[in-house]
């Protein structure tokens, strides 16, 4: 049995993705900042027959993130799928002319350093398995910079570049790296933006592989 690790797990997309992979027999590692939060999600999944455990870690704390992933592997088995989808903090989303150099540290730590820590941890295991998927979930500012959310735009651009390079480098090894762009956020009355529909799209990216970037709502997606 292998594991899907969801970093930034919440009651919307994270829980829906966990359910979708759980139906395929994956164990689920739920990682977020608050232990009680992920324990509640794990309990919900457990009642539905999904093997799930919660682990507390702030993605801006490299040691804590590595420890959470390490414990998940011990508890649940090797990680085959990594989803990186923490929600940006409100303070990351200031207008560009109000954003200082210091303001960029947090977004970059979350969206560039955090993914690098997680990928570098899981990559040896994926290479040993000879397969696997790394999934980056981002908003529209990862594609088109938005001056109203400068920190996130800068950091998501770095995350996108890192993901694209990983996609190109790891494809020959049978490891797929993909990015799902969700414009306008999750929900909002749009059927293809609902958590369950997005979770299905995420599972399809893992199953079918292909190109790096998919944008929800695009006809070619």
Question: Language-model segments: which ranges?
Answer:
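C-terminal helical subdomain
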Residues: 160-164, 172-221
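Active-site Tyr-X3-Lys motif and surrounding loop/helix of classical short-chain dehydrogenase/reductase
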Residues: 67-74, 94-98, 102-110
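A glycine-rich helix->loop->beta "capping" turn
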Residues: 48-51, 71-84, 207-211
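Conserved glycine-rich Rossmann-like NAD(P)H-binding loop of the short-chain dehydrogenase/reductase
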Residues: 25-39
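Rossmann-fold cofactor-recognition segment
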Residues: 45-63
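Catalytic loop of short-chain dehydrogenase/reductase
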Residues: 88, 101-102, 107-108, 114, ...
């Amino acid at each position: 049995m292998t594991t899907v690790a969801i970093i930034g797990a919440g009651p919307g997309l994270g829980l829906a993705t966990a359910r979708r992979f759980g139906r395929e027999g994956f164990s689920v590692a739920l990682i977020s900042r608050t232990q009680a939060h992920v324990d509640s999600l794990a309990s919900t999944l457990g009642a539905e027959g999904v093997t799930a455990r919660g682990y507390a870690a702030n993605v801006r704390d490299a040691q804590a993130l590595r420890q959470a992933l390490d414990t998940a592997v011990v508890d649940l088995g090797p990680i085959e799928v990594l989803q990186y989808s923490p929600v940006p903090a409100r303070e990351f989303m200031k207008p560009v002319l109000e954003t200082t150099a210091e303001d960029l540290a947090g977004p970059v730590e979350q969206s560039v350093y955090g993914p690098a820590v997680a990928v570098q941890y899981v990559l040896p295991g994926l290479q040993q398995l000879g397969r696997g998927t790394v999934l980056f979930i981002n908003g529209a500012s990862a594609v088109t910079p938005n001056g109203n959310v400068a920190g996130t735009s800068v950091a998501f651009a770095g995350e996108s570049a890192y993901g694209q390079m990983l996609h190109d480098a790891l494809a020959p090894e049978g490891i797929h790296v993909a990015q799902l762009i969700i414009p306008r956020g999750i929900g909002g009355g749009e059927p293809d933006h609902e958590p369950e529909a997005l979770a299905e799209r995420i599972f399809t990216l893992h199953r079918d592989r292909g190109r790096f970037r998919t944008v929800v709502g695009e006809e070619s997606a």
